[in-house]
Amino acid sequence: MKSTNLFTLLLFVLVLSSCKKDQLDPSGANCDAMEVSNQSTHVLIEQTGTWCPTCGGEKDEIQEAIDHHERVQHMAVHGGDDPFANDRTQDFRSAIIRSPYFPTVMGSTDPSFMDFLLAEAPDMQVKLDVKRDGSILKITAKIEILGEYECARENGCGVFIDGQQVNVFDFKSINLGIYLLEDGLDYPQANYGPLTHNDVMRDYLTEVVTGDQITDFGEEVSLGDTFCKYYEYDLTANNYHENIANCKIMAIIVEGNKCETTDTEWYLHFLGSDVFEVGNL
């Protein structure tokens, strides 16, 4: 009888422990308890270089946009002969920013248009939680569907054959990009002078630079659906940054599009985003 009771007690403890483990992701954050904002964010992706003679003025315009609204978020991707460029930023530029011209900003900096976008309720949004264990960052990202999201639409690809538009479907997927950014990087800007560079992309944490795929192309999602992804990042092994106190993690929902006539992504659209200051840990 005693052995039976002991077995029952051990079984209860094991079941209780497994339940707690399921509720807690590796970062120590309870994904179910993470509250995703129902407000839109506006993402500005800047292609830039310290050597670029016209990029200083573009940075002023971007800073005005950031100052205009607290929900404008920015990532600067440096390229060329630049102290803040590396193989990881080149991956990003090659995959996402196809224009060879400088400066290039993906996303509007017009105040009135930003106000219009930010007043709209988002179809989805992402929330970050970051813990630090020594040199390891443990990151939880939660995406929640907040509105009616269409995974396919007719005529979205705009394919023409013999001058006539073909009725094809544009299938969408939801991707999640996680990036390491750094503030407070001092370096002169060409034709501008001394400048402190902020929101500088240093590395990406996902397997794919354009973001890990959360849903398949055309996979239907419903209001209230949530998706959680977990990442670990070793600050010692990945020493792209200069000062971890000035670093932050940025999560971006990247919408991928694909025509039914091709197997490759042909368009990427930046949706919701969230930023977590690593220096606060």
Locate predicted features.
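Short, conserved sequence motifs used for protein processing/export or organelle targeting and
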Residues: 73-281
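Alpha-helix termination/capping residues and helix-transition junctions
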Residues: 13, 68-69, 99
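Sec-dependent signal peptide hydrophobic core
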Residues: 5-11
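Local sequence-structure signature of Cys/Sec-based thiol-disulfide redox active-site neighborhoods
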Residues: 30-73
